[in-house]
Design a protein with these regions (language model features):
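Noncatalytic linker/hinge segments flanking ATPase motor cores
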Residues: 66-68, 167
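Acidic/polar low-complexity surface segments
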Residues: 1-10, 51-66, 133-145
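Right-handed parallel beta-helix
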Residues: 20-31, 42-57, 71-87, 95-110, ...
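Catalytic domains of carbohydrate-active enzymes that cleave complex glycans
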Residues: 102-104, 126-215
């Protein structure tokens, strides 16, 4: 369908770089790709009671990362809401952890909340609920997806979360954990089921594992 995709504007509301012991709280943003991102050399950050809605951009790679821990450590995002994003609660490449996303809610979601890119470690998703056409929670072998991501992360924990698709895979020499999760029940619409199947098949094909999606 049609949507607003102009990109001639700022895309990140708050970017924390080389910052320690800081917080962002009680903020609502509209039309930004990203509400808050943390980068390397960033520690002890809290983002809480945040809202990120109606981003204006193309719905494609590199866009719509609502809450993005991209290299930070000891970062906590809690009680955050988003709509119409792709990766709501997401890690960047080789993010060391520990980090956590707690009590988050996303709707009209177009991609996964996950360790993204490659080999991040040590993150908790606790009571994260996602709804939408391609909403999912994943810690997977992303194979040749993107720029050749491969294994996205290790020592990830998904605790009491819900999404139309939840896919947690075990990387070599490490573990990922899925505890108390609900799939499909949170959003059992035809659109969500179709998106879940498409996402699942993409991961299975690129990681070359023998798994089949059961409707």
């Amino acid at each position: 369908g049609e949507y607003c995709c102009d990109e001639n504007h700022a895309n990140t509301f708050v970017a924390l770089r080389t910052v320690e012991n800081a917080w962002v709280r009680n903020v609502s943003v509209e039309h930004f790709d990203c509400c808050v991102t943390t980068t390397s050399a960033t520690k002890y950050i809290t983002g809480q009671d945040l809202s990120a809605i109606n981003p204006i951009s193309q719905i494609t790679g590199g866009r719509r990362y609502a809450y993005h821990i991209n290299g930070g450590q000891m970062c906590l995002f809690q009680r955050c809401y988003s709509s119409h994003h792709r990766h709501e609660f997401v890690l960047g490449a080789t993010t060391p952890g520990p980090n956590a996303f707690v009590d988050g809610y996303g709707e009209m979601t177009f991609a996964s909340s996950e360790p993204h890119h490659r080999w991040s470690a040590g993150c908790l998703w606790d009571n994260i609920v996602l709804k939408g056409p391609s909403a999912s929670l994943m810690a997977a072998n992303r194979g040749s997806m993107g720029s050749g991501h491969g294994w996205a992360g290790a020592q990830m924990v998904f605790w009491n979360c819900a999404a139309p698709l939840i896919l947690v895979m075990q990387p070599p020499t490490a573990q990922n954990f899925a505890i108390g999760l609900q799939a499909t029940e949170v959003d059992n619409s035809k659109e969500a089921r179709s998106g879940a199947k498409s996402t699942f098949n993409s991961i299975v094909n690129t990681s070359m594992i023998d798994m089949k999606y059961k409707d």
